[in-house]
Swiss-Prot record:
Its EC number is 2.7.7.1. One of its GO terms (cellular component) is cytoplasm. GO terms for biological process: NAD biosynthetic process. This is Nicotinamide-nucleotide adenylyltransferase. GO terms for molecular function: ATP binding; nicotinamide-nucleotide adenylyltransferase activity. It comes from Methanolobus tindarius. The gene is ffdC.
Amino acid sequence: MRRAFYIGRFQPFHLGHYSLIKDIARDADEVVIGIGSAQKSHEPKNPFTAGERVMMIKHALEDAGIKHYAIPLEDLQRNAVWVSHIISMTPPFDVVYSNNPLVVRLFQESGILVEQPPMYQREGYSGSEIRKRMLRGEDWKSLVPAAVIDVIDEIDGVNRLKSVSKSDKDYRD
């Protein structure tokens, strides 16, 4: 059995992630998805909780029939032991998929095979672009799987993002 690992923040999970994971699933029997910065939520750059991101991924990939594990991973501020931390928190995997230079370097230095897949329309499909559109009231739903729209609607995610993006100076008299 071949198992692959892919990590991201998924704030939110979007069609770029979805497309890449579908490609990974063609080469692997199962995909271990690391939900990075799991401890962060209710911030402009990280509005969704780890549990909400698990739901987004589970429902989107369930619809595609992709066997996967979504594992929340808290940040570890010591790069020298980061790979060991990941390995201790996830099911075993044979290959890592990433284009993040630090992630690639750390796994390669640990002797783990790393594949660097092409990014899927990176300029349009990015969490920061989607969050920007949410804040501006522009279309963001075309950039995420339908299951993600359902989760964000269920948790009132757009209004949460708008609330946490305000500054206290917005309330001065």
